[in-house]
Amino acid sequence: MSVYGLQRLYIAGAHADATSGKTFDTFDPATGELLARVQQASADDVDRAVASAREGQREWAAMTAMQRSRILRRAVELLRERNDALAELEMRDTGKPIAETRAVDIVTGADVIEYYAGLATAIEGLQVPLRPESFVYTRREPLGVCAGIGAWNYPIQIACWKSAPALAAGNAMIFKPSEVTPLSALKLAEIYTEAGVPAGVFNVVQGDGSVGALLSAHPGIAKVSFTGGVETGKKVMSLAGASSLKEVTMELGGKSPLIVFDDADLDRAADIAVTANFFSAGQVCTNGTRVFVQQAVKDAFVERVLARVARIRAGKPSDPDTNFGPLASAAQLDKVLGYIDSGKAEGAKLLAGGARLVNDHFASGQYVAPTVFGDCRDDMRIVREEIFGPVMSILSFETEDEAIARANATDYGLAAGVVTENLSRAHRAIHRLEAGICWINTWGESPAEMPVGGYKQSGVGRENGITTLEHYTRIKSVQVELGRYQPVF
């Protein structure tokens, strides 16, 4: 028997049975316990979700921006009231420590909805004078029905990040969470309905990549926002373009560089590096997994990093003292262990970790020890490829130009950071780094006000910040003639 029982779809403001006859299971990654059996959507279910979204979107868009704003603010209140219960659900589904899910996942999701609720009334057009008797004005209008496809590392946060700007702009959204962590999106749907969002404006369809493909190719959907891996993102983008030239937002993978210069506060640098590699057991797309350290301070830096890694408290996610949990799935566990084996085989020096944790309460979970490799080279797989697990690669460099060139020598461009006390060098280096999200003397915070997205193959478009509303609206230009029309014939 499962903990949460049978989970269905959420369509037209209510839970709904799927018609596929298929289900999949979701497990607690810390214990292996069956959490729920989840119904998988069929093509007919996706059609049903699109039809209800169209109907709901017309009602939603007809409301005033202030009305939409008030409803979204009510959803924020409900999320915050239920923070602890939602955090426990997220802990069970993702394996994250309860201290993390209580402080981060629902909190940051609610913050983003609150942010866009405030911006809903600020969506406006322009007036452009042409001549005394003629002018142009523009309207920003909603796209219609949008699709959101989420990743398994931040399920409810991603659902909030994608739905908030969409709904604030007057759109509807059909959201597909990852089949690895499918539970919390259904709770968000219930909250939206309770807050007053019309039926159909936020639907949830469950399933694997085949359901994501149905959404990406559906002619009734105007936009797809996807978070996940690069190769899957390319497939989504191809389907979206080939079917109906949908607009897309892609937040994809990364292999982000963290550059520690020789004048850095090394205690600060070590704190940043450990956070940038081991928060959420390393399952964060922006993690700074390529740590470039100037040669003169490398040994002192490594010493500080290893001291901090030794203090990491791996344990049961429900223990409030735990700050390091399991990986989200057995498949991810196998992938990470494969990369660790590759690092060893290619000659990287194992400084910490490097194995699965199997003693005592770790035995039934998908735990990997926080792993640090030194003496890494740019051509190693652990340096070139996204691992999405708790594996830090330390590389040394001599000059600023060398560090920048090597940091940019990747197809990724999601995030980057520098640690230095030299203000001029900090900004100079950041301006040369090819990444969409950058940090100076810090790492990892992505507040609602900050546009998030990548360069190169790390993404298209942005999430969060004011500019994201541009990706959920379209511009209509209207010319008005006050004078006499001048005929051509």
Curated annotation (Swiss-Prot):
Binding sites annotated in the UniProt record for K(+) 2: L245, K456, G459
Cofactor(s) the record lists: K(+)
Keywords, comma-separated and alphabetical: Metal-binding, NAD, NADP, Oxidation, Oxidoreductase, Potassium
Cofactor note as given: Binds 2 potassium ions per subunit.
The UniProt record lists the keyword Hydrolase: no
Catalytic activity, as annotated: betaine aldehyde + NAD(+) + H2O = glycine betaine + NADH + 2 H(+)
Enzyme class, spelled out: oxidoreductase
Source organism superkingdom: Bacteria
Binding site for K(+) 1: T26, D93, V180
GO molecular function: betaine-aldehyde dehydrogenase (NAD+) activity; metal ion binding
A Pfam family of this chain: Aldedh
E.C. code: 1.2.1.8
This protein's record includes keyword Cell inner membrane: no
Active site: K162 (charge relay system), E251 (proton acceptor), C285 (nucleophile), E463 (charge relay system)
Cysteine sulfenic acid (-SOH): residues carrying this PTM: C285
Function: Involved in the biosynthesis of the osmoprotectant glycine betaine. Catalyzes the irreversible oxidation of betaine aldehyde to the corresponding acid.
Alphabetized NCBIfam families for the sequence: BADH, PRK13252.1
Family, per entry: Belongs to the aldehyde dehydrogenase family.
Protein name: Betaine aldehyde dehydrogenase
Record gene name: betB
